[in-house]
Design a protein with these regions (language model features):
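Gly/Pro-rich turn-and-neighbor structural signature
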Residues: 1-47, 57
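Surface-exposed beta-strand edges and their flanking turn/coil or helix-capping segments
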Residues: 8-9, 29-31, 68-70, 105, ...
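Structured mid-domain segments that build the active-site/substrate or prosthetic-cofactor binding neighborhood
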Residues: 36-137, 143
């Protein structure tokens, strides 16, 4: 994100649209060191713009749509952060070329609810969705979603953006996800 101008201010009828490109997408913006400059510049844009700032967030791995992409919690936290900062709106661009992407319906459900009410907790929304959508496979799918999300929490040295290669998931993490996924279809 480019730094805002030092002296010039957007006119009152000019909306600033901020794309969140080339940053770590698998960790929340507020806690990942790779996102510090983005947050600093975003805060400044929010301060100088009267018509509002709108975020264009990326919720998919555009390099590989069907590979597990741990973004539910990171974008959920970002939605809360944007609300705290006074951002006027958020648009999350996900998979647009296939319906078979990683957890796209679940992600849309969680993020949509958080855009309506950013005080909601992420995990209960995931649980609610799994119970209502997956039926008998709900417990197995909930465990799978949590494993995908936890795959990048430790070690915190794993960072990935919206065009990541599959290397962001370790081999043990991939094997665990395969085992959990198999339980969802038995």
């Amino acid at each position: 994100l480019e730094a805002p101008p030092a002296k010039t201010r957007p006119a009152d009828n000019v909306v600033i649209r901020v794309p969140r490109l080339r940053h770590c997408s698998v960790h929340p913006a507020r806690t990942c060191p790779r996102n510090r400059s983005y947050l600093r510049n975003l805060q400044r844009w929010c301060e100088i713009t009267s018509a509002g700032v709108y975020i264009w967030e990326y919720g998919a791995n555009f390099k590989n749509f069907i590979f597990p992409w741990p973004s539910v919690h990171s974008i959920a936290d970002n939605i809360r952060l944007y609300a705290e900062m006074g951002v006027r709106g958020v648009m999350v661009q996900g998979n647009y070329v296939t319906t078979g992407s990683d957890l796209v319906v679940l992600k849309n459900y969680v993020w949509r609810h958080l855009m309506w009410d950013p005080t909601l907790k992420t995990d209960p929304l995931i649980r609610e969705f799994c119970d209502g959508y997956y039926g008998p496979a709900a417990d197995a799918m909930y465990a799978y979603v949590q494993a995908v999300e936890n795959s990048v929490r430790e070690p915190k040295t794993i960072h990935a953006g919206e065009f990541a290669r599959p290397g962001y998931l370790t081999q043990p993490a991939r094997e665990k996800l395969r085992r959990l996924r198999a339980k969802t279809i038995t």
